[in-house]
């Protein structure tokens, strides 16, 4: 079984994590490293994917500045989303040819990993036809957003954001993923208490390893 190298980055600015992803993706493309997984949190940040509409950012620049919320135009797929402490972010740097060479299948694998994590907490995670991510309560509320990019050399960047215990009011600043008729939720809200982020991270690592047939190994990141 191939190794999955896992790096914990703690809380890190979106742009700084993006720089790290690009460097690791270049190394993965050249075969200098194997499949890699970054786990982290972001400070309050709104990101716009390549399908995002600017008017789906509902707050004014002045309001966002007053609340300390950064806004970043990203090169990931998808629309507008919100990041904040208490949200577990996972960025896989994978050579897709080793996982079926199909972006849709890869995204379904990320969804499956999260669905299995939720099952461990007694929650039923679901897919919604025509939408990306993981949902609960029969598709009424989104608990995990997914947006990825595939490079010309077939290496993935960006990934998933699982709401463990973020301040959900931040999602009121946007139209999350361009969807107006469904809400956003978290593990803390659904369970009535927040599991430790480190515990959720360990479970997510294990499930990504199982779904993608990789053996996780946690290492410090040397850049």
Curated annotation (Swiss-Prot):
Pathway: Protein modification; protein lipoylation via endogenous pathway; protein N(6)-(lipoyl)lysine from octanoyl-[acyl-carrier-protein]: step 1/2. Belongs to the LipB family. Gene3D superfamilies: Bira Bifunctional Protein, Domain 2 (3.30.930.10). The active site is at residue 177. The lineage of its organism: Bacteria, Bacillati, Chloroflexota, Chloroflexia, Chloroflexales. It holds the Pfam family LplA-B_cat. One of its GO terms (molecular function) is lipoyl(octanoyl) transferase activity. It is an enzyme of class 2 (transferase). The gene is lipB. HAMAP family: LipB. This is Octanoyltransferase. One of its GO terms (biological process) is protein modification process. InterPro entries: aa-tRNA-synth_II/BPL/LPL, BPL_LPL_catalytic, Octanoyltransferase, Octanoyltransferase_CS. The record marks 142 as: Lowers pKa of active site Cys. Keywords: Acyltransferase, Cytoplasm, Transferase.
């Amino acid at each position: 079984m191939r190794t999955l190298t896992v790096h914990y980055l703690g809380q890190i600015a979106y742009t700084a994590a993006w720089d790290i992803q690009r460097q690791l993706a270049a190394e993965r493309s050249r075969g200098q490293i194997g499949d890699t997984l970054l786990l982290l949190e972001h400070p309050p940040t709104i990101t716009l994917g390549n399908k995002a509409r600017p008017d789906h950012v509902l707050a004014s620049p002045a309001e966002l500045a007053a609340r300390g919320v950064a806004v970043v135009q990203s090169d990931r797929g998808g629309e507008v989303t919100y990041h904040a402490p208490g949200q577990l972010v996972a960025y896989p740097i994978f050579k897709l040819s080793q996982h079926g060479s199909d972006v849709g299948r890869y995204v379904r694998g990320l969804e499956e990993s999260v669905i299995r994590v939720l099952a461990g907490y007694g929650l039923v995670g679901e897919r919604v036809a025509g939408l990306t991510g993981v949902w609960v309560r029969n598709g009424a509320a989104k608990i995990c957003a997914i947006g990825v990019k595939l490079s010309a050399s077939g290496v993935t960047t960006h990934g998933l954001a699982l709401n463990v215990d973020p301040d959900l009011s931040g999602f009121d600043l946007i139209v999350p993923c361009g969807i107006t008729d469904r809400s956003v939720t978290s593990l803390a809200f659904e369970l009535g208490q927040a599991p430790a982020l480190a515990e959720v991270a360990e479970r997510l690592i294990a499930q990504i390893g199982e779904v993608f047939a990789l053996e996780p190994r946690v290492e410090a990141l040397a850049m």
